[in-house]
Amino acid sequence: MKTLIFHSLETSSAKKLALDLGGEVELRKNHYRIHTKKDFDIENYRLSSDVDLNIFDNNFDYQNIRLMVSDMDSTLITVETIDEVAKEVGLKDEISLITEEAMQGHLDFTESFKKRLSILKGINNSVFESVYKNKVELSPGTEELIYYFKSNQIKTAVVSGGLKFFAEKLQSQLGIENCRANDVQIINESLTGNIIGNVIDAKEKAKYIGE
């Protein structure tokens, strides 16, 4: 028996997928599980689905978990924080152009982050607090997820290519033990457009986890 995690509560799509797999649908709090005996290529289903799909190992032993690491933007929270900051100060279009360049492969993450940061140069850092208070919302299930790991003595960490201010606020709010994100330079309460240390890209995330 295989279990497919359907990361959505979109009932009709879950049932359609279950029918295709000859499986049974199980409703959980924030997702569906599809139990099937049929062999299938998950990559094919991922390509044709707007919903995240993952295989759940029925033999997985939770006792072996020692660390849970999560991204922040559009993961633990529902928004992209740097985009929300840009909207707040009227720079949404400029930031969107850089995002589009990155999506087209013209910029890697480090280059795109530095360009976005340079656009935000000069803004008052009080905008961060405003965005966190008024725009940042936890994704459904975030609190339950962190509570589960902490109650089972499993360490938690948020590692993000976003801004350290938001990652640390989230860390404090949820009681997450470890945190790593981009630390930006602020002088006289204004962003200088410079980053302190390395940009937290995929390699830096992997390095931090290895520590």
Please tell me what each predicted stretch does:
Residues 73, 91, 122, 184-185:
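Short connector loops/turns at beta-strand edges and beta->alpha or beta->beta junctions
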Residues 75, 99, 156:
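Ser/Thr-centric signal marking residues that sit
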Residues 74, 105, 160:
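Residue-level signature of catalytic and energy-coupling elements of molecular machines
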Residues 127-211:
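C-terminal cap/substrate-recognition subdomain and adjoining C-terminal extension
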Residues 75-76, 107, 191:
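Hydrophobic "anchor" residues
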Residues 81-151:
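A metal-dependent, Asp-based hydrolase signature
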Residues 1-70:
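Non-catalytic pre-domain segments flanking phosphatase-related domains
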Residues 65-81:
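Asp-based phosphoryl-transfer active-site loop
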